[in-house]
Regions:
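Active-site and donor-binding regions of nucleotide-sugar-utilizing enzymes
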Residues: 8-31, 36-130
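A short helix->loop->beta-strand "cap" motif at the edges of active sites that frequently abuts
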Residues: 99-103, 207, 267
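A nucleotide-sugar donor-handling region in carbohydrate enzymes
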Residues: 108-195
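Catalytic binding pocket for nucleotide-activated donors in carbohydrate/polymer assembly enzymes
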Residues: 254-335
Length: 363
């Protein structure tokens, strides 16, 4: 009999959180778990998950059950509950929880900071005294909770590497863009930044650039020369997004879910980290860069300064041109370390099995 897992998620201002939860849900389902996802705005899920129906408060998609947690009816709760990113589980659900539920996992946001290893898998306050609740801390070390390495995506990365031109021409067929070896392709999915200054710097370069803009908030109301082509792309679902970041030579990327997909391409990227008060986001960025440092044989200081200036909205165009003019194996090397040592799903399921089997023996 399949073990059951319920995942809870809020959609707040962007779709990164539900993107993480859906990707996790798919991997759990593929490993023979019965998966249900409860989300506060089910009508918006269809924007990133192709095939979901925005008009239904309940549906099954690719084997996973989706519920609107403002409007659902269930008879039982799962053996394992995962609450993502401090979401509040509805009282109507908690009222049904009984001893059949073995474990509640508080899935936190990704971090490279050292302190997360001390909190990973430590007890958290549980709404039910007879159910264990723990913190689960995703991260970039073997002692952390790891990151989501879904097999579909890793296979896609390899497939596009082998047949990039074919994928490229098919994906951009409607736009009439054909792959060219003398063009540098850049994907832009960021929060607001000084985009005009960056373009002005690119114009001074001998490179030919094509930019794919995935952020509709960027101001494109300025002129640029013929050797720079800019395409404002329509909103993309998760599968389309996975393809375009692998087709690009460089990714400007924001958030957690998109950042991890960019990291797993093995290609260069700059992470636009979510801004926090008192510059806490810069501390988090510095922590990640420090993890990344050992994979650079050269140019670490250049990349470090690029990352900071990008996130502080300083002009970094000349440094960017200097960086991309050189070849870097560091991104592929770091990807290999992550794939080998930081598989979140494997770590999570190992922990779940150890805890639920222990609870069963105690019963």
């Amino acid at each position: 009999m399949k073990k059951t897992i319920d995942l809870f998620c809020d959609i707040v201002d962007n779709y990164g959180d539900i993107g993480v939860v859906y990707r996790l849900g798919k991997e759990l389902y593929n490993r023979n778990y019965k998966v249900r996802i409860f989300v506060n705005k089910l009508n918006e899920v269809s924007k990133i998950i192709k095939g979901c129906n925005s008009r239904l408060p309940y549906q099954v998609h690719n084997g996973i059950e989706f519920f609107d947690f403002n409007n659902f009816e269930i008879n039982d709760t799962a053996e394992i509950i995962i609450e993502a990113f401090a979401v509040n589980i509805p009282e109507s659900y908690l009222d049904k929880v009984n001893i059949n539920t073995k474990l509640i996992i508080n899935l936190e946001y990704l971090s490279a900071e050292n302190w997360i290893e001390d909190f990973h898998l430590k007890n958290s306050f549980s709404p039910k005294p007879y159910i264990e609740k723990v913190f689960y801390m995703p991260g970039f070390t073997a002692k952390s909770g790891g990151i989501i390495l879904d097999n579909y995506y890793l296979n896609l990365v390899d497939s596009i590497k082998k047949s990039r031109e074919s994928y490229f021409n098919n994906f951009f067929k409607e736009l009439g863009i054909k792959y060219s070896t003398d063009t540098y392709y850049i994907n832009v999915f960021t929060y607001n930044w000084n985009f005009k200054e960056f373009i002005e710097t690119l114009e001074k370069s001998p490179f030919k650039f094509v930019l794919f803009i995935l952020d509709y908030k960027l101001d494109l109301n300025f002129s640029y020369k013929d050797k720079i082509e800019i395409y404002q792309m329509p909103f993309m679902d998760q599968n389309q997004f996975d393809i375009i970041i692998n087709l690009s030579d460089f990714n400007f990327i924001r958030g957690e879910e998109s950042f991890i997909r960019a990291l797993l391409t093995g290609k260069p990227y700059l992470w636009n980290i979510y801004e926090q008060d008192e510059m806490l986001h810069i501390d988090k960025l510095e922590a990640f860069l420090e993890r990344f440092r050992e994979y650079f044989t050269a140019d670490y200081n250049l990349y470090h300064d690029l990352s900071l200036n990008f996130n502080l909205n300083n002009n970094f165009g000349n440094s960017f041109l200097e960086f991309i003019a050189r070849k870097h194996s560091s991104f592929e090397d770091y990807k290999k370390f992550i794939v080998t040592n930081c598989n979140l799903v494997e770590k999570l399921l190992y922990f779940i099995d150890s805890r639920t089997n222990q609870n069963q023996e105690e019963i």
